[in-house]
């Protein structure tokens, strides 16, 4: 591998721009369909767009702030000395593959990926397990670096530090590289988007792409007639299953009567009273229009409906 660019004095915007030039570790899981928070469809649109999206949230902020702590704890637990990479790296054999390592381990052909996670996700790290999209990320780093192994240190908030070692598997890396390069060749280069996979993140991406409708335009969807039939079939099945599910819930309620709780082997059931206060918006608009207008805001969205014409 080679150092593509130093990150010591690189701005966040330029760092993001460099990452558009190839496939990074965090792209790997999304391209493989393993990332629950990001999809291949999103990766594609990020790569072809000139827009630099500096996305951030509290979880990402905490992950950055605690990276030093996780690396320090890893060194304490293993005795290995680590150092910052301070660069975006590029595979010499597969130039499309880029990587931004958290840490490199001094004196070894190995690296370290630092993670933080909720205690509610602790089971995903138990018994040697690693969330699939993180494992894909580490395999990507092994592919770029050519190293023998990579470590993942995950801080489970308030619970424990989990350390896993991933050893290079040449067949796994070969398959990963093939899929990443095919994604780039088949989609990014010709600018042909991959099919969305039904996740919420793809819905958000599509809604962002086409926020405004053209009321004077009607699209010909004849080519999708088979898909529309399939959707209708699925909708009918879901409706039937929802009714069956509700009927079961009704039987359970009849059995519980006024009991707040119920038990069965493997199940705990609750049917408890609760109270909530809601604003009567119609009355507020009628009796206090100034206050209603003061705290109201216009929200623009496109409503999507499909009507089956029998």
Task: Enumerate the predicted regions with their spans.
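Accessory terminal regions of nucleic-acid processing enzymes
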Residues: 1-310
């Amino acid at each position: 591998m080679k150092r593509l660019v130093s990150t010591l004095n690189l701005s966040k915007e330029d760092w993001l721009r460099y990452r558009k030039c190839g496939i990074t570790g965090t792209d790997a899981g999304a391209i493989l369909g393993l990332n629950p928070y990001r999809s291949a469809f999103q990766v594609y649109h990020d790569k072809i767009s000139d827009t630099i999206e500096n996305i951030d949230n509290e979880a990402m902020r905490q992950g950055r702030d605690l990276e030093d702590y996780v690396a320090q704890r890893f060194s304490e637990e293993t005795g290995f000395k680590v150092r910052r990479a301070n660069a975006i790296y590029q595979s010499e054999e597969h130039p499309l593959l880029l990587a931004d390592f958290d840490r490199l381990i001094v004196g070894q052909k190995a690296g370290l990926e630092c993670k933080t996670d909720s205690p509610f996700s602790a089971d995903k790290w138990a018994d040697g397990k690693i969330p699939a999209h993180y494992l894909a990320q580490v395999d990507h780093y092994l592919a770029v670096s050519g190293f023998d192994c990579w470590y993942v240190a995950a801080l489970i908030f308030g619970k424990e530090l989990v350390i896993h070692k991933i050893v290079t598997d040449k067949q796994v890396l070969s398959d990963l590289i093939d899929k990443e390069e095919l994604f780039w060749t088949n989609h990014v280069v010709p600018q042909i988007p991959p099919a969305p996979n039904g996740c919420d993140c793809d819905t958000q991406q599509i809604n962002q792409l086409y926020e405004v409708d053209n009321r004077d335009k009607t699209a010909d969807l004849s080519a999708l007639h088979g898909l529309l039939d399939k959707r209708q079939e699925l909708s009918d099945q879901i409706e039937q299953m929802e009714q069956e599910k509700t009927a079961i819930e009704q039987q359970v309620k009849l059995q519980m009567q006024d009991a707040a709780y119920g038990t069965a082997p493997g199940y705990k059931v609750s049917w408890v009273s609760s109270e909530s206060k809601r604003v009567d918006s119609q009355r507020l608009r009628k009796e206090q229009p100034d206050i209603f207008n003061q705290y109201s805001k216009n929200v623009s969205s496109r409503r999507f409906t499909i009507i089956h014409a029998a």
